[in-house]
Amino acid sequence: MRAATVAQIKKELKHLPPEELQALVLRLARFKKDNKELLTYLLFEAGDEYSYIESVKSMVDEGFDSINTRSTYFAKKSIRKILSGLRKFIRYSGKKETEVELLIHFCERMNTMQPPITRSQVLMNLYDRLVAKVRATILKLDEDLRYDYSVELKSRLDEEL
């Protein structure tokens, strides 16, 4: 996600009512390092969650495409870097549906990685923890969404193991 310039953010803030502006700033206070990216999400991308999810998925795909797979050490390091960025974007959204969608996509990309993650116990443990986290998050959703995401999780991940 490319952060907007300070001028663009300032221009967008002029159009917000004071109550909304105050809520944005209070939420911003929780994040110290990535304030600019969070404001970009809140002002420009929060209204269209689907396109936000797709842009984050494309960044995950780019990260996986650039992984150095010659050494499992570098592969593990790259995967952890991608995952930490993904967690940051999930935190910006704060929606469980977004979290489930992005983590399923990340796990799916881990499954299709070459060389396979089954060669590294550390990567398998990371994968298992992520799948467990997805399942736990699915349980927190509404019943309809819970069923839909459970079916999607089963079809996209369990078949590939």
Per-region residue spans from a language model:
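Short, surface-exposed loop and linker segments with low hydrophobicity and enrichment for Pro/Ser/Thr
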Residues: 12-22, 88-105
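Amphipathic, non-membrane alpha-helical segments in soluble helical-bundle scaffolds
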Residues: 46, 50-53, 72-76, 93-101, ...
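Residues that form generic nucleotide/phosphate-binding pockets
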Residues: 12, 42, 59, 63, ...
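N-terminal interaction modules that seed assembly of large macromolecular complexes
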Residues: 2-67
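Aromatic-anchored, charged helix-turn/loop surface patch used as a conserved interaction hotspot
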Residues: 50-90
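Charged, amphipathic alpha-helical oligomerization/scaffolding segments
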Residues: 27, 31, 55, 59, ...
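Glycine-rich, aromatic-bearing surface loops/beta-hairpins
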Residues: 101-161
